[in-house]
Amino acid sequence: MAGMEIVYTANEVYSRLGVSGSTLRKYSDVLEREGYEVRKNSRGRREYTEFDVVLLQHLVELSKEDGMTLEKAAKLIVKEYGIANKKEEMKEVNPMPYHVQYQLHEQYSAMVAELNRVQQANLLEMEKRLSDRIDQRNALIEEDMSDRKEREERIEKRLERRDENLMKMIREIQEAKRIMEEVAAAKEKKLWWKFWE
């Protein structure tokens, strides 16, 4: 896989970055002082990988920020990408090349983004299910309240009818009692007149 890696010449890189050849050399030197190594061919000329170009592009952008020196920017980049100092790296038995670190970092970032997307989708699905369940429960409560209201209205109407019937009966009883009293009084009056005849 390393043999298939694309390499760029200094001319290609500074054209791509929009800087001069001397600026590219200066930026490469600054990165190398911080422990990053750009490989060189048999004639001692630098050969740039895609990862090298990414770092240099980042360095160009950072160095344009207010109060940011080239050295500060290089230190930040080396720290951000976890690039060890050359001397420390030589102590390692099998140091991981920077471009592999970069690829792993990109893959990890993609995995984290995908995991976040899946978690977000799951959360939205759970929220939807919970919302649906709450809606169903609210609908059942409303239906139950509606049924209860109808029952109460029916009971109230029955009680009203019963009260009306009771009042009607009371009036009828009172009317019958009044008539009976009138009849009794009329009979008594008649008997009294008979007594005097």
Curated annotation (Swiss-Prot):
Alphabetical GO biological process terms: regulation of DNA-templated transcription
TM spans (from-to): none
GO molecular function: DNA binding
Key words of the record: Plasmid
Record's protein name: Uncharacterized protein pXO2-68/BXB0093/GBAA_pXO2_0093
Organism of derivation: Bacillus anthracis
